[in-house]
Amino acid sequence: MHNLELPVIVEPTALEAVLDTDGLLIVDLNEVQAYVQGHVPGAVNLAYASLIGPRPPAMGTIAGTDQLSAALSGIGLLPDHHVVAYDSEGTGKASRFLWTLDVIGHANFSLLNGGFHSWAADGHPVETTANTPAASSYSVTLGNSAIANKDYILGHLDDPNMVVLDA
């Protein structure tokens, strides 16, 4: 088991310090064209569409377990990985991915503060070679513990351990 501990929102400098650490999986949620133009070293690209279920009339719901399992296995996710996710479009794709991980019970994750734009603007290393991870066999079970309604949020405003991701 890996013992990498990062805050929920990780600064670019802190991420750079652990880039070569076992158990770290960096996930880029940008379009593939943007990914190949530059990404955080070691990052794998994940298509945002693989996280979304095509279930009318509620388009944009979470994907089913088979679809999620295939997507997460495709990026080589293991249960003990610490995932750091980012995007550069400001669309919330990375936050939505982390929420998805929370819904399926994968608790070790962080969001790169400022996304890729901040990473690159601060002069951190950038690579253009696509990373192809070894596939894993990640099993997915959906839960509801990561869905918070207004009453839950109001009841936990003073809880320093509560983090709200608007995804």
Kindly give the residue locations of the regions a language model identified:
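Positively charged, proline/Ser/Thr-rich regional signature most characteristic
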Residues: 2-80, 154-167
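Thiolate-centered catalytic microenvironments shared by cysteine-dependent enzyme domains
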Residues: 2-4, 59-160
